[in-house]
């Protein structure tokens, strides 16, 4: 694998969302948002637990009503992952969920109310040591900024964000992160670039309302990838009109591709052609589903023929190179065995699980030695 220098991240202050550190060099946190009715406690808890299983660091929950706030109390008691309450329009809901142990408040300054209401929310957050996310969105800019700029622009999003950053500064509150989201990739990227030069608080990245599973993943990969490659961003959400679990998977895939943070298996697979000696696509799809529980970072190359297979296998944790009836299995760049093409999936799953256990044990021993 090419020896790329690590991305130099923007310096920022640190806050904590529950027990998850955000900013100041902490691992970039991946989060999602529930799409159940919050008042359906069972469904919401089940979805949050599903997000936890695929690695969500933080989960946001919409709390649109006081009934939802009461449901939030019950939800919080049944999950372990830190929860962010998404609050719009009614500041009193923010005060209520703060009583119930919320880990972070997300407010949209364009619709939460006047300065006095914001002050009440901030005072409550300070008293209970709850961080705030200032969530600026191109679709809900303040009316005066809409009139001033005519349309959402990077300068408009920046002015909205700075207006409320300044407000929190005047209230001597510094436990916050900021987002300036837009559905347009260029608008979002430039807004974040401008904001990154103005403040040193952590930045939450996102391309809002990005689209369905395919188009939304592409937009997010481009927008977030550009910013992350420049060292901008401390936490992220991939917004998809899809199962929230997919948001977490895509988020980790983006970080994995940039070598910022790895979780689970990085599959390297050829797009296939008539040279393939076994069903590459079927093998990859099956293994991705079967091995979702593996969190050990490792590269697995699955190549259908000998044209590129050996080269990819040399730089993979495990690699398969297609051959006639049997395919070569490489481990850490060394050819170890041959696998029957008719039983490829089961054999490879077993080898990957064994390798993951081996790597986990080696890391455990390393940690013990360091602690001594």
Curated annotation (Swiss-Prot):
<dbReference type="GO" id="GO:0016114">
    <property type="term" value="P:terpenoid biosynthetic process"/>
</dbReference>
<feature type="binding site">
    <location>
        <position position="270"/>
    </location>
    <ligand>
        <name>[4Fe-4S] cluster</name>
    </ligand>
</feature>
<dbReference type="GO" id="GO:0141197">
    <property type="term" value="F:4-hydroxy-3-methylbut-2-enyl-diphosphate synthase activity (flavodoxin)"/>
</dbReference>
<dbReference type="GO" id="GO:0005506">
    <property type="term" value="F:iron ion binding"/>
</dbReference>
<comment type="similarity">
    <text>Belongs to the IspG family.</text>
</comment>
<dbReference type="GO" id="GO:0046872">
    <property type="term" value="F:metal ion binding"/>
</dbReference>
<feature type="binding site">
    <location>
        <position position="312"/>
    </location>
    <ligand>
        <name>[4Fe-4S] cluster</name>
    </ligand>
</feature>
<dbReference type="GO" id="GO:0005829">
    <property type="term" value="C:cytosol"/>
</dbReference>
<feature type="binding site">
    <location>
        <position position="273"/>
    </location>
    <ligand>
        <name>[4Fe-4S] cluster</name>
    </ligand>
</feature>
<keyword id="KW-0004">4Fe-4S</keyword>
<protein>
    <recommendedName>
        <fullName>4-hydroxy-3-methylbut-2-en-1-yl diphosphate synthase (flavodoxin)</fullName>
        <ecNumber>1.17.7.3</ecNumber>
    </recommendedName>
</protein>
<keyword id="KW-0560">Oxidoreductase</keyword>
<dbReference type="InterPro" id="IPR045854">
    <property type="entry name" value="NO2/SO3_Rdtase_4Fe4S_sf"/>
</dbReference>
<dbReference type="Pfam" id="PF04551">
    <property type="entry name" value="GcpE"/>
</dbReference>
<comment type="function">
    <text>Converts 2C-methyl-D-erythritol 2,4-cyclodiphosphate (ME-2,4cPP) into 1-hydroxy-2-methyl-2-(E)-butenyl 4-diphosphate, using flavodoxin as the reducing agent.</text>
</comment>
<keyword id="KW-0408">Iron</keyword>
<keyword id="KW-0411">Iron-sulfur</keyword>
<keyword id="KW-0479">Metal-binding</keyword>
<keyword id="KW-0414">Isoprene biosynthesis</keyword>
<dbReference type="GO" id="GO:0046429">
    <property type="term" value="F:4-hydroxy-3-methylbut-2-en-1-yl diphosphate synthase activity (ferredoxin)"/>
</dbReference>
<dbReference type="InterPro" id="IPR016425">
    <property type="entry name" value="IspG_bac"/>
</dbReference>
<dbReference type="InterPro" id="IPR011005">
    <property type="entry name" value="Dihydropteroate_synth-like_sf"/>
</dbReference>
<dbReference type="GO" id="GO:0051539">
    <property type="term" value="F:4 iron, 4 sulfur cluster binding"/>
</dbReference>
<dbReference type="InterPro" id="IPR004588">
    <property type="entry name" value="IspG_bac-typ"/>
</dbReference>
<comment type="pathway">
    <text>Isoprenoid biosynthesis; isopentenyl diphosphate biosynthesis via DXP pathway; isopentenyl diphosphate from 1-deoxy-D-xylulose 5-phosphate: step 5/6.</text>
</comment>
<feature type="binding site">
    <location>
        <position position="305"/>
    </location>
    <ligand>
        <name>[4Fe-4S] cluster</name>
    </ligand>
</feature>
<dbReference type="GO" id="GO:0019288">
    <property type="term" value="P:isopentenyl diphosphate biosynthetic process, methylerythritol 4-phosphate pathway"/>
</dbReference>
